[in-house]
């Protein structure tokens, strides 16, 4: 694989990041990816500071390689975890669900490389101005929360708009897709769905089986009505949710939002892949083992 400024700057064997997937990206998966030569990432999610500290320290016992933390900026504990990553000596942070601007000075002073996930050129430019080391341009093919632009359209536009390195995400599962985004100007890739079936991934076997059995047309985007579109694998819940989403006369936004609460944990931890949310990207059908 080609060597780029990403792996060279971070001391990686490969310029491959593991996505900071909520309820999935724990110490076990992060350590596994880092030990294999990529950048493993722990998802802070809605963890408080001490919960994240525990996961970071657990990861340190499992690898002596560099690993990162993904911080969800809309978390009520974002302030706490923003301090914990500094205290624990984390060297790479990826961010999502908000603007990391208020924490940038603190992180940069600590020598942390901040790499925000961006769905648009405008946000990429803003992050460059604020001091980001790189940006992750994530297309709508990805699992979880998605933007409007595809990876093929977004990546070259971001590459042309900023001078910092661009990492491509969304719709990447094998070497052909990695080569393709490098041709678009990316310096690295972030992969999520492909890692869901890894032995180091601690999600339920039912969730893994759902990925392994997925067809090319099996993902769907829900949540557009609330302004938070999410890509997942079709199941009984997505069908019920979609029906409710289009029934605005009888289903309020609040009721719709409540329908989605706890669904990801239900699939990941309890193995309920019928009524839980099985987040996955459009490349799920390419994952066979």
Regions from the PLM with identified roles:
Residues 1-165:
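Active-site entrance/lid segments in N-terminal catalytic domains of soluble metabolic enzymes
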Residues 21, 171-172:
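Active-site metal-binding loops of divalent metal-dependent hydrolases
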Residues 153-167, 173-289:
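Conserved active-site-proximal phosphate/metal-binding subdomains
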């Amino acid at each position: 694989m080609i060597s780029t400024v990403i792996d060279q700057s971070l001391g990686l064997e490969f310029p491959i990041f593991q996505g900071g997937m909520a309820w999935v990206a724990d110490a076990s998966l992060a350590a596994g990816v880092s030990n294999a030569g990529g950048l493993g990432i722990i998802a802070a999610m809605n963890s408080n500071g001490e919960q994240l500290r525990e996961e970071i320290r657990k990861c340190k016992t499992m690898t002596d390689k560099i690993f990162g933390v993904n911080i969800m900026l809309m978390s009520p504990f974002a302030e706490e975890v923003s301090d914990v990553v500094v205290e624990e000596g984390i060297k790479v942070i990826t961010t999502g669900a908000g603007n990391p601007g208020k924490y940038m000075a603190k992180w940069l002073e600590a020598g942390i490389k901040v790499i925000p996930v961006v769905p648009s050129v405008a946000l990429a430019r803003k992050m460059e101005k604020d001091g980001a080391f790189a940006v992750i341009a994530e297309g709508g093919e990805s699992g979880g929360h998605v933007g409007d632009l595809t990876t093929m359209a977004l990546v070259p536009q971001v590459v042309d708009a900023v001078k910092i390195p661009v990492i491509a995400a969304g719709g990447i599962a094998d070497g052909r897709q990695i080569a393709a985004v490098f041709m678009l100007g990316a310096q690295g890739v972030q992969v999520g769905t492909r890692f869901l079936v890894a032995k180091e991934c601690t999600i339920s076997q039912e969730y893994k089986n759902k990925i392994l059995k997925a067809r090319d047309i099996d993902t769907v985007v829900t949540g557009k009505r609330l302004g938070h579109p999410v890509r997942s694998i079709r199941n009984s819940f997505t069908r019920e949710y979609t029906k409710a989403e289009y029934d605005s006369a009888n289903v309020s936004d609040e009721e719709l939002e409540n329908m989605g609460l706890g669904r990801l944990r239900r699939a990941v931890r309890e193995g309920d892949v019928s009524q839980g949310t099985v987040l996955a990207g459009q490349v799920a059908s390419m994952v066979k083992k």
